[in-house]
Amino acid sequence: MSRLLCPSSSTSVVRRARPTFVLGNLSIKQAQGTGASSALARRRRSTFAATADGLHVIPLEQKYPFPWLRDACRCPDCVHPSTRQKLFCTSDIPVDIQPATNGVEEVGEGVKIRWSNGHESLYDWDFLKEHSSSVSRSEANKDLPRVGWTRASIAKERDLYLEYEELKTKEGLRKAIDHTCRFGLLFIRNVPNVETSTASCSLRTLAHYFGDIRTTFYGELWDVKNVSNSRNIAYTNLGLGLHMDLLYFQHPPQFQFLHCLRNRVQGGSSIFSDALHAAETLRIQDAASYSVLTDVQVPFFYVNDGHHLYHTHPTIEVSASGDVNQINYSPPFQAPLLLDTPPAFFTALHQFSNLVNSDENTYEYTLEEGDAVLFDNRRVLHARRAFEEIPGQGVRVGEANRWLKGCYIEGDTMWDRGRMLR
């Protein structure tokens, strides 16, 4: 595919003497001397200021470097009108690109820049505001802020439990996705549980409301029930501590569904803990320990049943800006630590473990037949209490008395669906 370059891409910058501070077609000094236009100059001076290092937008308290602005031009020569795809490379832009002399002008919609080679770009106020900070970018993308929770606070959320029928409407589905994005935990009641086959079960329909199912070596959908000679502790009746799934993958699944088909046992309640809340609490209580958990790589592995998977992750994964992106905590699948693991790591992990396992931070619920739970596998830890089968509970021959069916959901597809619904 040929690459169409914007006019400035192949034209060198013509350096000319120009005022240090330009507003429209007048420098400040020139504008102040015009008398009748002094009020206009004052108004413009409070909105935009062009200096040698970029465009300053006064109300937003933000500076936009000229190379960034040239790269962000959205005119038809720079961005294809129908595909909305960029028609040039960032590397095509001269690193020292500047506007032409007196080439910055405030217009009704925002600010127009005439570059040194004659190309013109228009940046409206909404665009500049959208890109002024990470918060404003998230708002423009219709992303929702994550809200940390404790046992007491999550119990008060009115959308923690929703009805399956609600998801068949756009408003109901939006409400479900919004709640999951904010809190990472959602229960759905009265999901049909008569059909149990993987091909036509209701979990498949339920999952597709939210996004695309992610296939792993467990398949598209999988069953969680007590089986003999299990190769995974989840397929026993033993208690299972707080953990996340598939951390031995480079990119573990973002969301997980569990649908309760049968529950005629004693015990077996599900436990959830917001590891994001625990991480933020640790950051406040002990910044040094928090830092250790963001730095030290922890290995996870699965070597069983014809598979050999291994990957390392920090316990707390942060973004370039320092925000917590996701958590990686799964003691059952943790491999031997690296030999250079510092002693401080053990203290830090002990503190983190105490936080996620504390009674005040764990939410417990026994799934009833027809209940489904959706949770963020990169944020919310899940566990299960041990259970005992009760004879004579009326299940069909060969069926387990406790039977969950599960699947994973790709995060991007659910976030995409949520943005469109908003």
Curated annotation (Swiss-Prot):
Q: In which pathway does it act?
A: Mycotoxin biosynthesis
Q: How is it used?
A: The structure of strobilurin A was used for the development of the major class of beta-methoxyacrylate agricultural fungicides since its beta-methoxyacrylate toxophore targets the Qo site of complex III of the mitochondrial electron transport chain and prevents adenosine triphosphate synthesis. Compounds such as azoxystrobin (Syngenta) and Kresoxim methyl (BASF) are among the most widely used fungicides worldwide. This class of antifungals are used as effective treatments against a broad range of destructive fungal plant pathogens and make significant contributions to food security.
Example of a GO biological process term: carnitine biosynthetic process
An example GO CC term for this entry is: mitochondrion
Q: Pfam families in the record, alphabetically?
A: GBBH-like_N, TauD
Its biological purpose is as follows:
Dioxygenase; part of the gene cluster that mediates the biosynthesis of strobilurin A, an antifungal polyketide that contains a key beta-methoxyacrylate toxophore that targets the complex III of the mitochondrial electron transport chain. Strobilurin biosynthesis begins with construction of benzoyl CoA by step-wise elimination of ammonia from phenylalanine by the phenylalanine ammonia-lyase str11, oxygenation by str8 and retro-Claisen reaction to form benzoic acid, which is activated to its CoA thiolester benzoyl CoA by the dedicated CoA ligase str10.
Under which name does UniProt file this protein? Dioxygenase str8
What is the species of this protein? Strobilurus tenacellus
Which gene is annotated as encoding this protein in its UniProt record? str8
